[in-house]
């Protein structure tokens, strides 16, 4: 049995990653998932979080992935998300400003914008955390 499987991370703008990996950790609304080669076929929603994977050469990699859908079929996994970026592509200053804007919107108490502000806050915090890890 092969110990790797194909991972594709796709956003509306571009393909972020396409290669073989040994394992991946990602989050859905229930918790943290670990996916290994030959995993059962499945589809799950994902939440904005830091995704960690080990590539075929054994290198550990991390990136921010916003909410989306993960599909596993015939030893191939595709993550479709609104946005995804490795630490090198994250502008820390921009992420911190986004966090401040989201916090301000939450304090204003506009019910319509509350969920959007909470999601924006989560995305900015995860981006900041990833950037500070590296």
Curated annotation (Swiss-Prot):
Membrane topology recorded in Swiss-Prot or TrEMBL: Peripheral membrane protein
Protein localization: Cell membrane
Main localization of the protein described in the UniProt heading: membrane
Origin: domain of life: Bacteria
Keywords, in A-Z order: ATP synthesis, Cell membrane, CF(1), Hydrogen ion transport, Ion transport, Membrane, Transport
Gene Ontology cellular-component annotations: plasma membrane; proton-transporting ATP synthase complex
Pfam families (UniProt xref): ATP-synt_DE (PF00401), ATP-synt_DE_N (PF02823)
A molecular-function term among this protein's GO annotations: proton-transporting ATP synthase activity, rotational mechanism
Function: Produces ATP from ADP in the presence of a proton gradient across the membrane.
Assembly and interaction partners: F-type ATPases have 2 components, CF(1) - the catalytic core - and CF(0) - the membrane proton channel. CF(1) has five subunits: alpha(3), beta(3), gamma(1), delta(1), epsilon(1). CF(0) has three main subunits: a, b and c.
Matches recorded under PANTHER family: ATP SYNTHASE DELTA/EPSILON CHAIN, ATP SYNTHASE EPSILON CHAIN, CHLOROPLASTIC
Annotated family: Belongs to the ATPase epsilon chain family.
HAMAP family attached to this UniProt entry: ATP_synth_epsil_bac (MF_00530)
This protein's name: ATP synthase epsilon chain
Species: Clostridium botulinum (strain Alaska E43 / Type E3)
